[in-house]
Amino acid sequence: MATVVDLVCGMDVDTEMDPASSVYRGQTYYFCAPGCKVAFDEDPERYLRGEQDTGTLVPQEPVTTLPVDVAIKTRRSVARMKPDPVPREAIERMLEAAVWAPNHHLTEPWHFIVLTGSAKRRFAELRRDLRRTLFKNPDAPEIQPALKKIYADTLSMPVIIAVTTTAPDDPDLRDDDYGATMAAIQNILLVATSLGLGTYLRTGALIHYAPLLEFLGVPAGRRIAGVIYVGYPDHIPNRRRTPSINKTTWLD
């Protein structure tokens, strides 16, 4: 495997994974995402001087430097985090960005529950317990390593944020508030990326698990929209997306 450094964001790039690339003055440069290539192409001399949009090492002090389009295209679902603590200021900046998401009639339907310490341990137990319910014989010896791994992997996340929203009977209002809350979650993910943090958004059966709702104190009339893991990335996967032209219909 040949690994080089993305001059824009400082992340490692595996050149054998067919990453985005640009040729400048006869030299080929590789990038972890198309957004980094776009930024480089706009001002290559800046990045050749070493003026990265984020440090080669993940910054321990949060500094927002990534342009919005670069943050969007370099955001990844990061499953492996470093144990380094995440500054409270970083979490607060992410949540402050979240509340500026568009929401119909200014309902501001979101609420954020930040888990650390013993609360995070209890969350890890509940996620393990949920997985147990999926096995016909959850006490079987061969199942135990998988359950232990789920617990350990969840506990290894430095910060966990549960995002709740309203669950009104009116289907129109329900859709409006859910859409607004997911936009708020996207704001969280993008600001985290701009701060050098990794995130992983979980939904599925977890957000409907009654013991978790009870633990988090989610009242009747509300539901969990998603759970976000936050930390400094230990590994950032390369990803591709289908070009928008293949997903777009223009009507005139």
Regions found by a protein language model. Name each.
Residues P19-T28:
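Short linker/helix segments within small regulatory modules
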Residues Q60-T64, A71, I224-D252:
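C-terminal helix-cap and adjacent tail motif
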Residues D53-S156, D252:
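N-terminal amphipathic, basic helical "cap/leader" segment at the start of enzyme domains
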Residues E16-P19, P44:
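Short Cys/His-rich "knuckle" micro-motifs
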Residues D12, P34-G35, A39:
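Cys/His-rich metal-chelating microdomains
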